[in-house]
Amino acid sequence: MDGEQLGMIGIAAGLFGLLVAFFLYNKVNSIKIENETVAKITGRIYDGAMAFLWAEYRLLSGFIVVVALALLLGGEENGLGFETMIAFIIGAICSVAAGFSGMRSATSANGRTAQAAADLSLIHI
């Protein structure tokens, strides 16, 4: 198996993983939170988490710009500065997307987990 085939397998596995994650996210989000207090708390946790991420990524964006420029200028000797900078920026964007989707999934699941446990009479809310 050559490198190109391995690359295609990696891409296919990544896309499959995204599909599974999307399916599970939608399955969890299909659970309705019936308790008004739990729904309100879940909403506030979500709002706080998103505010934190926006503040963090706003700060991080300056770091990303500085490192990207350092990669661009530092790689002029071997001619790989531009390519390395682009790879770094793509990685940073993917990291931000993973952070947002992970935080959104986690905060969304909190209240729904409590609701599902209550539906099974495991807890009283």
Q: What name fits each language-model region?
A:
Residues D2-A98, G102-A106:
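N-terminal alpha-helical transmembrane segments of multi-pass membrane transport
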